[in-house]
C-alpha cells in the first residue's frame, strides 16, 4: 500500500512540476519580449579644437578621452591627434552605460599631450580639460531597450608653452 501511494504521489508531483515549468515560460505581464541581461550600451565620439594661448591652432597634439576613477586610476577610452587647424575627432566608440553619466559624475576628462617634441611651433605643457568645461550632447536616439543612443563630446583647450 505504501509503495502504491508513493507511486501516485510521485506521478502527481511530476505532473504539477511540469505544469509549473511550462507556465514559467509564458509572457511576462502580457509582453512577448525576452528578459534582457547585461548592460545598456551607447556610443560616442569626441571632438574639439586646441590652440596656443595666443589663439594659434596647434597641430599634432594628442587628445585622450579618459574616465577618471580618482585614486583607482584612469580608463583611457579613446584618443585622436589634432590637424593643422587644431581640430581633432575621435572615432565612434561603443561603451557600457552612457557617456553622459560619466560626465554628470564629473569623471570625464580630456588630456592634451604634446607628443612631437616642438615640431608644432614649440613644446607645450600637458593640460587636462575637466568635466566642467566639456559638453555632452545626444545626437542619436537608441533602438530598443538597451541601446541608449549616440553622443557627441566637445572639449576645446588652450595650451601653455613649456618654460
Locations of regions flagged by a protein language model:
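Sec-dependent bacterial lipoprotein signal peptides
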Residues: 1-26
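Beta-strand-rich domain onsets/edges
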Residues: 26-45, 49-55
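Extracellular beta-sheet/turn segments enriched in Thr/Pro/Gly and aliphatic residues
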Residues: 28-36, 125-163
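Short, ordered, surface-exposed loop/turn motifs in non-cytosolic proteins
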Residues: 52-72
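Short, acidic Ser/Thr/Gly-rich low-complexity loop/linker segments typical of extracellular
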Residues: 71-94
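Short Pro-Gly-centered beta-turn/loop motif in secreted/extracellular proteins
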Residues: 89-107
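Short acidic/polar inter-strand loop motif in beta-rich domains
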Residues: 115-122
Amino acid at each position: 500500500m505504501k509503495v502504491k501511494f508513493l507511486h501516485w504521489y510521485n506521478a502527481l508531483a511530476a505532473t504539477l512540476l511540469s505544469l509549473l515549468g511550462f507556465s514559467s515560460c509564458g509572457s511576462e505581464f502580457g509582453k512577448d519580449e525576452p528578459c534582457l541581461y547585461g548592460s545598456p550600451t551607447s556610443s560616442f565620439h569626441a571632438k574639439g579644437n586646441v590652440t596656443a594661448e595666443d589663439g594659434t591652432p596647434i597641430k599634432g597634439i594628442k587628445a585622450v578621452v579618459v574616465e577618471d576613477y580618482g585614486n583607482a586610476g584612469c580608463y583611457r577610452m579613446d584618443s585622436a591627434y589634432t590637424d593643422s587647424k587644431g581640430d581633432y575627432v575621435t572615432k565612434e566608440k561603443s561603451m557600457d552605460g552612457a557617456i553622459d553619466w560619466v560626465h554628470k559624475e564629473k569623471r570625464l576628462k580630456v588630456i592634451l599631450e604634446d607628443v612631437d617634441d616642438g615640431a608644432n611651433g614649440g613644446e607645450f605643457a600637458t593640460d587636462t580639460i575637466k568635466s566642467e568645461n566639456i559638453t555632452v550632447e545626444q545626437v542619436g536616439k537608441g533602438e530598443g531597450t538597451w541601446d541608449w543612443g549616440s553622443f557627441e563630446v566637445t572639449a576645446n583647450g588652450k595650451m601653455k608653452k613649456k618654460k
